[in-house]
Amino acid sequence: LPTETKVTSDIIKSNIIIGQLEKQTLDKYQLQNCNKLMIVAHPDDESLWGGGHLLDKGYFVVCLTNGNNTVRRSEFYAALKEYGCQGLMLSYPDLEGGKRSDWSKYTVKIVQDLELLLTYKKWDLIATHNPKGEYGHIQHRMTSQLVTDVYRYAYKGMNRLFYFGKYYKWNELPKVQNSLIPLSESKLERKTQIINTVYKSQDVKWDRHMMKYENWISFQAWRE
């Protein structure tokens, strides 16, 4: 389970290192009636793990990577338009030297960006990857860790952080299926349509068995 560290606290209090995000950028958005924040590692994560929720609107979605990738940036903003939500992309690396980045060189900047996001206003709900990174993706786990650390610092005593639901492999799903609440048929159909028509650069077939489930778990419940 992620725990708040002194390092995170020191980073938040520091005014020396600046991340990629500035308050002036957030000021350009109309966030008065936008009370829910979703933070994801990659474009399409917002749809795979939270598309049904996004259809309820009212979300500001922040993607940490691929802001410099023309195709993936275009797909991300097209998806948000379909959901009727606002959002932005940062440009932390997905890959470095052909390998998946562990973000070790960028942690300080990411934490500062997250602190700005979480304290820009008091969000009613904050959603992000779960501590296991769904199927174990290192950048999903890192996103969860850093968001949780900043949340603990900025939202003490509150119950506003939610993790994406637990991931189950194909052969595991039948054992737990009865305990999961599926999306409504209309939401699943619309979510699937958006993913299929917008994210043409990505192959998400291997995650299809989890598409109908978005059983988010509160920070408190995950700890129990």
Regions found by a protein language model. Name each.
Residues 66-68, 94-95, 132-134, 167-169:
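Short, solvent-exposed loop/turn segments at secondary-structure junctions
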Residues 42, 129, 137-140, 198:
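Histidine-centered active-site/metal-ligand motif
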Residues 115-118, 122-132, 140-143:
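Proline-aspartate-enriched helix->loop->beta-strand connector
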Residues 131, 135-152, 158-160:
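Catalytic domains of cell-wall/extracellular-matrix polysaccharide-remodeling enzymes
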Residues 154-224:
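The feature marks non-catalytic terminal segments
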Residues 63, 89, 125-129, 159-165:
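A structural signal for short, well-ordered beta-strand segments and their strand-loop junctions
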Residues 2-121, 149-156:
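Active-site rim/loop-helix segments in enzyme catalytic domains that contact anionic ligands
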Residues 48-51, 135-142, 174:
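A short acidic (Asp/Glu
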